[in-house]
Amino acid sequence: MKIVLLGPPGAGKGTQAKSISNRYSIPHISTGDIFRKNISENTPLGIEAKSYMDNGQLVPDEVTINMVKDRLQQDDCKNGYLLDGFPRTVHQAEALDNFLTEREESIDTALLIEVPKEFILERMTGRRVCPSCGASYHIKFNPPTNDGKCDLCGSDVIQRKDDTEETVKERLDVYENQTQPLIDFYKNKKQLSVVDGTQAINEVFESICKILGSDK
């Protein structure tokens, strides 16, 4: 089973990716992990990627694509995989398609966890964290018992810079501009499956399993 996982920041992709990986016994492949591994192991692609990053430049598509190709040819991908964070653009999706076609393979489904912008804003801007012990809270869904204080150590909880309304809106705008053409790409290929991400975590996973089926 070969799956592409799509969804906005704050949609819970990481949580669902872990559950899908465990349920269907396929590796969860994130571009972040691929980059870190290549760079830490000083592979030729890792060295090339790091040279761009050190100069404050974006890593070219071809480098990312080649890293993903290398990863998909490893033994643990023989029975499928879950791609998270790739493809991000139609160009990358086309490159993935071409690579799979050469191997007489194809993506089984592009799984979109769909969550309205307002819901994401509430979910992400409400997050709070304790800088001392790392405990996580949410001002609406899981607030600390003592207003503004960590239940575990008593420190003041804070909002991370990534969770401010301005930052979240910027990330969502980037996501929409980048991902809508990608959603249309998979929709036109009749490979897109959509899940309501506003449900409870277990309900989202149940919906995903209905789409993917019961076979491992």
Swiss-Prot record:
Main location: cytoplasm
Region (LID): 126-163
One Gene Ontology term, aspect cellular component: cytoplasm
UniProt pathway: Purine metabolism; AMP biosynthesis via salvage pathway; AMP from ADP: step 1/1
Sites where the protein binds AMP: 31, 36, 57-59, 85-88, 92, 160, 171
Localization in the cell: Cytoplasm
InterPro entries xref list: Adenyl_kin_sub (IPR006259), Adenylat/UMP-CMP_kin (IPR000850), Adenylat_kinase_CS (IPR033690), Adenylate_kinase_lid-dom (IPR007862), P-loop_NTPase (IPR027417)
Function: Catalyzes the reversible transfer of the terminal phosphate group between ATP and AMP. Plays an important role in cellular energy homeostasis and in adenine nucleotide metabolism.
Family: Belongs to the adenylate kinase family.
Name of protein: Adenylate kinase
